[in-house]
Amino acid sequence: MKGKHKIVVKNNRLHYEFEIKRNITIIKGDSATGKTTLINMIRQFANLGNASGIEIECDATCTVLEGNMWQMLLKNLSGNIIFIDEENQFIRQQEFAELVKVSDNYFVIITRENLYNLPYSV
C-alpha cells in the first residue's frame, strides 16, 4: 500500500476526518480528546457494519488490532489501515516492530509513549 489515504469516521454526533501519508502514524494527545473514541467507533463498525450507526469512508479497509491473537491477525491482514490503542502492550515488543516493518498495511497507533523501535511520524 502506497500513497495518501483519507479517512472519515462519523456518526450522528462525532466526525473525524484526517489523511495519513506514511505507513506508521502515531496519534498523541491529552486525555479525553477522543482518541480512544475513534478506535471504539472503528471497532463497532467492524463488528456491526451499518447497524452500528457509524460510517467509514476510506479507500482501504480500516480495522482494529487488539488482543492476544494479534500476531496471527496481523500476519493475515494485507492492504488495511490498522488502528491500535495504547492499552495493547504488544506495541512495545520487538516482535511487533519486526512484523510492522515487513507488512504492507498502514498503522495508526494511539499512544503517549515513544516507540523507539518503530520509524514513525507524529
Where are the predicted features?
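Hydrophobic anchor at the beta1->P-loop junction of P-loop NTPases
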Residues: 27
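Conserved glycine(s) of the Walker
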Residues: 33-35
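N-terminal pre-Walker A segment at the start of P-loop NTPase domains
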Residues: 1-16
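Sensor-1/coupling segment of RecA-like P-loop NTPase cores
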Residues: 99-122
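Post-Walker A helix-loop "phosphate-sensing" segment adjacent to the P-loop in P-loop NTPases
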Residues: 44-55
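P-loop (Walker A) phosphate-binding loop of NTP-binding proteins
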Residues: 30
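Conserved P-loop NTPase "ATPase switch" module shared by AAA+ and STAND
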Residues: 70-94
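Post-Walker A alpha-helix
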Residues: 38-40
